[in-house]
Amino acid sequence: MVVTIPQLQQWKRSGRAIAVLTAWDWLWASLLDQAGVDLILVGDSLAMVALGHKNTLPLSLDEMLHHTRAVCRGVQRALVVCDLPFGSYQESPQQAVRSASRVLKETPAQAVKLEGGYPAMVETVTHLVRAGIPVLGHVGLTPQSVHQYGGYPQQGKSVEAAERILSEAIALEQAGAFAIILEHIPADLGLTITQKLSIPTIGIGAGPHCDGQVLVTADALGLSERQPPFAKAYANLRETILQAVQEYCNEVQTHQFPGSG
């Protein structure tokens, strides 16, 4: 069954949780799709996990399009969403429509994601949805604002901050977002937002009560050197890969591989 936006929204109503992971190329996308991931996010986190940048800000729209095309070639079932990178949508709703239109025209992705729920961004989401472009919202910790935060601290800890994030989520739903990512907020706030919205919430460090969960695949598989505090590693692939490559190098260097036969 091919996953669609209406299907995700039906799953919220039925209580079936949504599994989301990130991918940045054909290989990872094909593995995630075969494993049953519901939504594959071509996240701008690829700037860090695939391209070696210190944060997500250097990534360009052309680079996102390149990686999204590669991801889509590996997907048969999952819904694919492309992150709009920093600087490709904040200037105006018109800029956002141009950038998002390129995503839908130049890749097979079905939707875009952007960060923020402040009034200007809500207006942008309204324009995108009116243009027929599905939007995945994102509130709480928004990594493209890393320099404003001075890092990646939890958001929504004060009453005022929690009320603001809740208001942003409601405004994004009213603007037409089909789902919203809640990142690095207290679990009780994640529950409140999930109960208030009729669209799915996808949590990352937002507690167990969201309608779905997302992790960066490098974190979920134990490839990252440093894990976020809310991530869970389901494997230790970093160590497995290091050991395998070291064994290969040793066998080549000592003339054990390929054998004499």
Swiss-Prot record:
EC main group: transferase
Residues binding Mg(2+): D44, D83, E115
Chain residues that bind 3-methyl-2-oxobutanoate: D44, S45, D83, K113
One BP annotation, GO: pantothenate biosynthetic process
Active site residues per record: E183
CDD domains, sorted: KPHMT-like
Catalytic activity: 3-methyl-2-oxobutanoate + (6R)-5,10-methylene-5,6,7,8-tetrahydrofolate + H2O = 2-dehydropantoate + (6S)-5,6,7,8-tetrahydrofolate
Pfam family, one: Pantoate_transf
Keywords: Cytoplasm, Magnesium, Metal-binding, Pantothenate biosynthesis, Transferase
InterPro entries hit by this protein: Pantoate_hydroxy_MeTrfase, Pyrv/PenolPyrv_kinase-like_dom, Pyrv_kinase-like_dom_sf
Enzyme Commission number(s) from the entry: 2.1.2.11
GO cellular component: cytoplasm
Summary of subunit composition and partner proteins: Homodecamer; pentamer of dimers.
Family: Belongs to the PanB family.
Name of this protein: 3-methyl-2-oxobutanoate hydroxymethyltransferase
Lineage: Bacteria, Bacillati, Cyanobacteriota, Cyanophyceae, Gomontiellales
Gene (UniProt): panB
